[in-house]
Amino acid sequence: MMPGPRPRKGPQARGQGVAAAKQMGLFMEFGPEDMLLGMDEAEDDEDLEAELLALTGEAQTTGKKPAPKGQAPLPMAHIEKLAADCMRDVEEEEEEEGLEEDAELLTELQEVLGVDEETEPLDGDEVADPGGSEEENGLEDTEPPVQTAVLTASAPAAQAGASQGLHALLEERIHNYREAAASAKEAGEAAKARRCERGLKTLESQLASVRRGRKINEDEIPPPVALGKRPLAPQEPANRSPETDPPAPPALESDNPSQPETSLPGISAQPVSDLDPDPRALLSSRQREYKVAALSAKRAGELDRARELMRIGKRFGAVLEALEKGQPVDLSAMPPAPEDLKPQQASQAPTAPSVIPPAVERVQPVMAPDVPATPVAPTESQTVLDALQQRLNKYREAGIQARSGGDERKARMHERIAKQYQDAIRAHRAGRKVNFAELPVPPGFPPIPGLESTMGVEEDAVAATLAAAEKLASAEDSAPADKDEDEPPGHLQGEPPAQAPVAKKPARPTVPSSQRLPEPRASSSKESPSPSVREQLALLEARKLQYQRAALQAKRSQDLEQAKAYLRVAKWLEAQIIQARSGRPVDLSKVPSPLTDEEGDFILIHHEDLRLSQKAEEVYAQLQKMLLEQQEKCLLFSKQFMHQGNVAETTRFEKLAQDRKKQLEILQLAQAQGLDPPTHHFELKTFQTVRIFSELNSTEMHLIIVRGMNLPAPPGVTPDDLDAFVRFEFHYPNSDQAQKSKTAVVKNTNSPEFDQLFKLNINRNHRGFKRVIQSKGIKFEIFHKGSFFRSDKLVGTAHLKLERLENECEIREIVEVLDGRKPTGGKLEVKVRLREPLSGQDVQMVTENWLVLEPRGL
């Protein structure tokens, strides 16, 4: 059943919609008179009407008050009068407030009353008079402004007597915290020093508040702290260097001349600063003059005078700080202007150090005018800790001077050195071992007590090592004569002094120069070195000893430049030894190769009456040639294993090279003595070697086009008229950016010798390079050079595959020259080299006929 339409409502009665809207708050009538004069219930208030009539001056009527809508506005004269009254009240209040805050009136009042500026409160609202407070009495402030200022200024004077005990307590507590902070800094307790400094700042702020007349909470005063034991009390303050002493607090002075200078500031009756109208401005201007003069002296190159002026200028900062804290200072000893300082110091220099007693120097060193122009040498310390502290203070002062002079780099350097000394002091106090040789020493400082200076030889390393070599030579010359070789003793007596090394050859294996260096510093490592590290150390020490001996031989032969070069290498090897002992890795590929002394370290003895047969000379020459070849092979294999980092194989081949050298020396000595060639035989020895081209980088590949053999000539050209050149193309990094080049033209031959090297850029780990190696290789094209009107003619092509570079570091092939796919009979010899194979190592087994000399043959 479908719902029917809703029944329509009847027409709404007229006026019902407006009534509903008014009921909902719409169409409300607002009158401006209602909003200004108030609500309806206040219209018939008789009190308000009477007050209004009294204000307007009209008589009260008994009739009914007209409606607000018909009320006439107030006369303009009354409105202007009310506005003038309101404005007059505000102006009077502002005028009174301006009188209370007028600085000129307050200054004039202080001069009349004689009240000190420091004891006057900064804000009159904080110290209020209980009798004249307008908040407590609720009265209007109708008193004159001068009377208010008098009450405000007299309040702190009443409170000054009550705060005498609190003032003395705060000063005593400040003195306690300063001593505790200094003791903690000397003991190296940074945390305690920071706590004391925070408490000191709190006490200073509380003392400043008390001096200004403000109230403080006594419960918030920091408690006293224990001073503790200072590590070293200075027994001779007169001998202390002014450069290492921290700035002492300024001297205190009172009106009474018989009163000691160390009296407290609260006891002094009249501070000296009252005699000077503005001591702070005078001190600031004088400090600025000294800084400008120091900067000018530094720019002029007078560094000593610049340091002196900067040191005096820094002392003004301590005096200004004391003046800000309210402490009285004595300006009678203030240094003069910088331009008057130099003649005054020259006249006072002979008598100044003996006039001032030590006590006065400690109480009032801030404004001392007689600063020594030259730095005083520090006294020798009695303990290690005292010496370290002296050096720490020296470097701190140097850092401050450098920063004040604008040299930030030098300041950071001195701060780093000071940090090293702080760590050393902390470690020494903890009982740990400290390597004092690594700490820099300031100029002019004596050595640390109980330790010998081991750094003197570093000033001239070459001269010191040569001197040690001279001692070694003198020690070897004094060796017994019964340790000589099998030589006629009468012959040695007839030799000149330049041939004296014959007698010292047996003593060379026991050269003490390997123990000369300060190697015990590496003994601080707790773990014993591993076998590989021991092998590295043995290799490096043997190599260093070899270069030291070579330097000694070069010095004896008057070749000082060569001796210095060998000593530099020995010093570098010494640094590598220290690095290896400390556990850090050493790059053996950078270790220099062993020296190959072609002349040998022996003397050839020539006998005029000895003549060898032609056959014996040929045998000697052949044996020497074989020994030299075997020695060179051993050195080559040793170098290859060194670049691989294989210490064991490197040492093995170096020993074989030394054995070959020794056999060669024996052979040459036998030949010099005129003996028959020694008995010898050959042994087959197989060596496992690793091939590497150390002169190549890992990012380059060498292509060498060696020669062409029987290259075909193009039609119309005879083989003898062939002008051939080779062009190659290597598709890396891609085909569009292939690396291309060509050889020079070799004319008039079909077997040209090119022997030309090309360097190709590669990336061993790139996938594109490996793809080119495995699939594409290198393409070669052989051309015949055309004439002026003729272009180049293609002779043939060749292709070299590079898959063998995966396991080999060199490919040497003779590739066939093709004409399309047809062989032409020509050949092209090429080589490709990498530093190392792409994967693995190029291990080769080499078999040699090893020459062995029998000792019985001599």
Curated annotation (Swiss-Prot):
The modification Phosphothreonine is found at residue 596. One of its GO terms (cellular component) is nucleoplasm. Residues 676-815 form the C2 domain. It is found in: Nucleus. Transcription factor that binds specifically to the DRE (dual repressor element) and represses HTR1A gene transcription in neuronal cells. Keywords: Coiled coil, Nucleus, Phosphoprotein, Transcription, Transcription regulation. InterPro entries: C2_dom, C2_domain_sf, C2_Freud, CC2D1A/B, CC2D1A/B_DM14. Residues 166-212, 611-635 form a coiled coil. One of its GO terms (biological process) is regulation of transcription by RNA polymerase II. Residues 153-164, 520-532 have a biased composition (Low complexity). The modification Phosphoserine is found at residues 209, 593. This is Coiled-coil and C2 domain-containing protein 1B. SUPFAM superfamilies: C2 domain (Calcium/lipid-binding domain, CaLB).
